Amino acid sequence: MIRIVVSGAAGRMGRRILELVQGDAETTLVAALEAESHPLVGQPVAALAADVPADKPSDVRVASAPDAGLAADVIIDFSVPEQSIKVAALAAERGWAVVVGTTGLDAAQKQRLAAAASKVAVLTAPNFSLGMNVLFQLVAEAAHRLPGYDIEIVESHHRFKKDAPSGSALRLAERAAEATGRDLSKTAVYGRHGLPGERTTPEIGIHALRRGDVVGEHTVTFTTLGETLELTHRAHSRDAFARGAVHAAKWLAGKPAGQYTFEQVLGI
């Protein structure tokens, strides 16, 4: 049985991951973590996860920190960058593998994740859905096969998302840039306004929409004079991401220290 800690347990993703971990025959929930100031700290996880099998009751309560002697195999974190860094440091100290689904980390924060990976297995991904990860591959292939086409990326998420553009949109741009030998730091254009002038071929446009309760939509277009190829992924619910994160945690358990990707989990 794989022992799992969930960090960011009261968040939209955290709640669903709690349910999936408790409902999986191969995993058991050993801790659920939230910010110290969160009103649900001290409450049973049943207050967060309603869809749990009756034969797998849990006595776990939401806590701001794990017990000193807690035995665990993997911690799954979907929170905010500042918390994710603390979680990675905690995992390195305790010897737990860590799955990080938080996006919006800056360069310094990514370096701290890399430091944790020198001690434990660390898996980071901008998106844990199978379909989206296939889209990463398709975009790289299309960019390679369609040199000179104008590449534009449009992502849409719910009004509550804090970072923009999404980590998935940035990964799509990275894959397109890698496939065409471009330096994304020099060719990325984040939205347009005013009089930017004519579009240049090396540009990769990245645009973010925030509206309602959209779970996640990403469209990449490759356009030249006379035609457009459009590739789109739409998430219908957070289950696509939550199931992928739990699958990644099960795969990561027992792996040696190092940095891992969800593409490795999927074998693509």
Task: Locate predicted features.
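Hydrophobic, well-structured mid-protein blocks that either form specific transmembrane helices
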Residues: 116-161
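N-terminal Rossmann-like NAD(P) cofactor-binding module of classical short-chain dehydrogenase/reductase
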Residues: 75-76
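An anion/phosphate-binding loop that grips the pyrophosphate of nucleotide cofactors and donors
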Residues: 72
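Short gly/pro/ser/thr-enriched loop/turn and capping motifs at secondary-structure boundaries
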Residues: 38-39, 105-108, 129-132, 160
